[in-house]
Amino acid sequence: MFGRDPFDSLFERMFKEFFATPMTGTTMIQSSTGIQISGKGFMPISIIEGDQHIKVIAWLPGVNKEDIILNAVGDTLEIRAKRSPLMITESERIIYSEIPEEEEIYRTIKLPATVKEENASAKFENGVLSVILPKAESSIKKGINIE
C-alpha cells in the first residue's frame, strides 16, 4: 500500500486531543483512595504513602527551581510553577511544537493524612520535584491493645 494508513492521522489526532485536554482548563480529580487533586497545566504527579510520611513526586520539565512555590498546611499540599517559553532567535520561527507555551501550572492536593509542614523537605533535580511530608502524630496508625 502506498502512503500512510488513513487511521494513522485519526489516532494521532485523538491522541493529541486526549493529552491536550488536561493541559488547558482547570481540572478536578478524585481517586478511589479519597485523594482529591485540582489544578491547571501539565504536571503529572505520583503520591506515595509510607508509615511515617507522604511523598509527592511531580514531573516539571521546562521549569526552573526558582519558579516553583510549595505550600503545605494540614492535609493539603499546593505546588505552583511557571514554565518558561521556548528560547528562539529572531531568525527562527516555531513551525510545530507540542511543548506548552509559557504557562503557570499548579496542583492542589488533598493528602490522605495531616502532615507536619514545618518538617517537610523538597528537592528538584532533572525536572522532577520530590516532596517528603512527615505525617502528624494524629495521622500515624497506632495499634490498640485489647484487654
From Swiss-Prot:
It is found in: Cytoplasm. One of its GO terms (biological process) is protein stabilization. Its main location: cytoplasm. CDD domains: ACD_sHsps-like (cd06464). Residues 36-147 form the sHSP domain. Chaperone that confers thermal protection to other proteins. Belongs to the small heat shock protein (HSP20) family. This is Small heat shock protein HSP16.5. It comes from Methanocaldococcus jannaschii (strain ATCC 43067 / DSM 2661 / JAL-1 / JCM 10045 / NBRC 100440) (Methanococcus jannaschii). The lineage of its organism: Archaea, Methanobacteriati, Methanobacteriota, Methanomada group, Methanococci.
